[in-house]
């Protein structure tokens, strides 16, 4: 059987600050703001760790540009993947849910 892509783990019970911090987690380098400032909020920390992995993936994709031949393709596909997963993360914050993103959740579990 196919595993579902979005897995709802829990709902958030926080305030507006928690939602803004969780949303900032998926906006590139801004993932460090909630990661450093909201370690005590489990909801924000969950999203911050996923945002950190997405940011690291985008940095690695930039290094792929230096590969001759396949670098531009690899960068393009990686950038599209990061963009789509960031949008899914922002949607999960807008719906006040925590969804484990595919491909990312395995790396987040190691952090």
From Swiss-Prot:
Residues 39-50, 94-111 are lumenal. It is found in: Magnetosome membrane. Disruption phenotype: Normal magnetic response, no change in magnetosome size or number. A double mamF-mmsF deletion has a normal magnetic response, slightly smaller, fewer magnetosomes. Deletion of any 2 genes encoded in this operon (mamC, mamD, mamF and mamG) decreases crystal size regardless of the protein combination. Deletion of the mamGFDC operon leads to smaller magnetite crystals in irregularly spaced chains, but no other phenotype. Subject to cleavage or degradation; identified by N-terminal sequencing of proteins that are about 103, 92 and 15 kDa in size. Residues 1-17, 72 are cytoplasmic. It comes from the Bacteria. Induction: Part of the probable 4 gene mamGFDC operon. GO terms for cellular component: magnetosome membrane. Belongs to the magnetosome MamF/MmsF protein family. May form homooligomers. Plays a role in regulating magnetite crystal size; partially redundant function with MmsF. This bacteria makes up to 60 cubo-octahedral magnetosomes of about 45 nm in diameter which contain membrane-bound crystals of magnetite (Fe(3)O(4)). This is Magnetosome protein MamF. The lineage of its organism: Bacteria, Pseudomonadati, Pseudomonadota, Alphaproteobacteria, Rhodospirillales.
